[in-house]
């Protein structure tokens, strides 16, 4: 607990035990969806059997998210600050539950990787259009069965339209607020568009993204180096 994660040796040591990218993706997901039945609850780790298997987080039980428990106000909650709270209550974010994330953020490599992967998500699955379209697709696929649920569980199912709209509002507005919280927490500035182009014979990988087309544009911070790789066919 006294190790300084800014020390490369300490960070390398813990990186041998946990899958760092998995830990980053897990925290980004929980923070973005505003799951407030976490991080002091619903936590599980797993690892592959055999030597060298690193511990990974498991994402599950996320129904305390997307604004549903908070009557539609979740999209403007600063869940990043919530996830690093040093003196939280016994539930849902006590100090022990935020400790690992807080310590890892002491390391500049982890910080930069966290910020860049968050930007990757802002540029892809966390766009408002993507989330609203996904929501509408799911809602449409089950809307015909809703009357059956309303007949069987009238008290819980009659608010179908209201709750779908809560999730739609969250999908529409969350990225705007979450980007502001990210910028404030890490003192980020100079968000800019970055264009990437590949020639026939290969693809490019930007951080965690491999675009399907040979041209792609995303938004990143000029003060955080990004990782670009050429991948031959």
Question: Residues of each region from the PLM?
Answer:
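Secondary-structure capping and domain/repeat boundary segments
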Residues: 185-233
């Amino acid at each position: 607990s006294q190790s300084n994660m800014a020390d490369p040796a300490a960070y390398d040591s813990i990186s041998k035990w946990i899958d760092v990218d998995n830990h980053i993706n897990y925290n980004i997901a929980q923070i973005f969806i505003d799951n407030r039945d976490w991080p002091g609850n619903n936590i599980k780790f797993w690892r592959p059997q055999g030597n060298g298997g690193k511990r990974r987080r498991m994402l599950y039980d996320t129904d305390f998210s997307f604004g549903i428990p908070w009557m539609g106000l979740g999209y403007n909650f600063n869940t990043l600050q919530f996830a690093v709270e040093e003196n939280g209550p016994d539930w849902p974010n006590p100090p022990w539950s935020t400790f690992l994330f807080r310590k890892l953020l002491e390391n500049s490599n982890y910080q930069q990787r966290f910020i860049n992967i968050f930007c990757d998500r802002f540029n892809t699955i966390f766009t408002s259009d993507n989330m609203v379209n996904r929501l509408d697709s799911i809602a449409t696929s089950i809307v015909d069965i809703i009357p059956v649920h309303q007949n069987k569980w009238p008290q819980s199912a009659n608010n179908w339209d209201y709750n779908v709209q809560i999730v739609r509002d969250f999908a529409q507005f969350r990225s705007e607020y979450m980007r502001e919280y990210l910028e404030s927490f890490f003192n980020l500035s100079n968000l800019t568009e970055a264009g990437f182009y590949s020639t026939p014979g290969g693809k490019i990988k930007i951080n965690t993204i491999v675009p399907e087309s040979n041209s792609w544009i995303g938004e990143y911070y000029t003060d955080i180096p990004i990782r670009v790789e050429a991948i031959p066919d």
